[in-house]
């Protein structure tokens, strides 16, 4: 799995409320979070399937 999958969920600095998914390294699964729309990090996916393919395997 790519190293960025280990990063925490990062909402970013903007104030949008966009549903997104991130890989939770503690639970070893992808989870939903609210993305602010800018900034953040690479551990952010538009769909849970994309997250699972990239970080779960």
Swiss-Prot record:
CDD domains referenced in this protein's UniProt entry, alphabetically: Kunitz_textilinin-like
Pfam family, one: Kunitz_BPTI
Domain BPTI/Kunitz inhibitor: 5-55
InterPro entries: Kunitz_BPTI, Kunitz_BPTI_sf, Prtase_inh_Kunz-CS, TFPI/VKTCI-like
Tissue specificity: Expressed by the venom gland.
Keywords for this protein: Disulfide bond, Protease inhibitor, Secreted, Serine protease inhibitor
Subcellular location: Secreted
Gene Ontology cellular component annotations, sorted alphabetically: extracellular space
Any one GO molecular function term: serine-type endopeptidase inhibitor activity
Top-level taxon of the source organism: Eukaryota
Disulfide bonds: 5-55, 14-38, 30-51
Signal peptide: none
Site positions per UniProt: Reactive bond for trypsin: 15-16
Family: Belongs to the venom Kunitz-type family.
PANTHER family with a match to the protein in the record: BPTI_KUNITZ INHIBITOR DOMAIN-CONTAINING PROTEIN, KUNITZ-TYPE PROTEASE INHIBITOR-RELATED
Function comment: Serine protease inhibitor that inhibits trypsin (Ki=0.0035 nM).
Protein name as annotated: Kunitz-type serine protease inhibitor
């Amino acid at each position: 799995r790519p190293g960025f999958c280990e990063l925490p969920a990062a909402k970013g600095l903007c104030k949008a409320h966009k549903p997104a998914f991130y890989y939770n390294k503690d639970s070893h699964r992808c989870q939903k979070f609210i993305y602010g729309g800018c900034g953040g990090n690479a551990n952010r996916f538009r769909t849970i399937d994309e997250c699972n393919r990239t970080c779960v395997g």
